[in-house]
Amino acid sequence: MIGTTNGPTGIKLKSSRSNALRHLWKFTAAVVLLFATSNVADLARGEESAQENVAKIVFISGHPSHGPMAHEHRAGNMILADALQRSGLNVKCEVVPHPGYPEDKTIFDDAATVVVFCTGHRGHVLNPHLDAFDELMKSGVGVVMIHWATEAEKGKPGEKFLEWMGGFCDLDWSVNPHWAPTFDSLPIHPITNGVQPFSVHDEWYYHMRFVDEMKGVTPILSDLPPPETLRRPDGERSGNPAVRKAVAEGNPQVVAWAYDRPGGGRGFGFTGAHNHVSWQNENFLKVVLNAVLWTANQDIPKDGCPTPSINASQIKENLDAK
């Protein structure tokens, strides 16, 4: 009797517990699946958002203009693009695959900033495209002009350069000596993040033509040129009364500057980089990398953009055939 009575009761209890455990496992599995699905969706949304926020940087390189290891437009741009692409920062670099203004204008679609390294003045790549490029600038796209690219013709080109980056190299006002300024007093600005005092011998243009009262302009690299930078007779790029007076009065000369446009957008002018080997100076390179990021409205790490050391072999890569 005891076996007959307790046997069925025990079986029912065991079956009930098994069902409960099965339901618990199903519930747990459903919860885990729900959270996993949610996390995957969040990750996908995060990746999509990150892709949407990637800063696209376009590089324009001019045709060859000087001898080997001077005015290496494409090679210089490739150094910058490669360093930025490897930085781990949220950027995407696109170097125009041919010298001159882009044949495929869609490369500018969604661009955050444009880097221009080319022959200046009458040979500037932007001269035939001022109106189209102006539309980009008015939409808030940034711009970086390197070395001779900072030199514009008087008239409409110069006026546009003032609007886009606050200053330009102007014939019969600016000069182009080779010298070794010492940059030991750096301003507090995102472009100087991680930059240490340095000196590089290069062709540093100075006595730029700036907007009135330098409104919106922040000097980034400045120094007082020595008298020997003005030993040449007066000429378009060698000297003039105004620059001689400025140096004689002890006014430090700006060779790199940042510009906040009143209507939105940022510009940066950098007069060095005649000598291709200058890119081997880490601080020289970091200033320009930081400036590219700044004009693209990107946050710059407190130690600046991660900056590679360019060795003797790497500096000879991507050179133009000359």
Predicted regions and their residues:
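Extracytoplasmic/secreted proteins, especially bacterial periplasmic and envelope-associated proteins
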Residues: 75, 79, 128, 132, ...
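A glycine-rich, often tryptophan-bearing local segment used as a flexible ligand/cofactor-contacting loop or short
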Residues: 123-197
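Extracellular ligand-binding/catalytic regions of CAZymes and related secreted enzymes
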Residues: 48-55, 79-82, 87, 229, ...
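Short, low-complexity, charge-dense intrinsically disordered segments
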Residues: 5-17, 21-24
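Bacterial N-terminal signal peptides
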Residues: 26-39
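Catalytic beta-strand/loop cores that center a nucleophilic Ser/Cys/Thr
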Residues: 170-263
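Boundary at the C-terminal end of the N-terminal hydrophobic targeting segment
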Residues: 41-46
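Helical hinge/lid and interdomain linker segments adjacent to catalytic or ligand-binding clefts
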Residues: 49-51, 58-60, 64-152
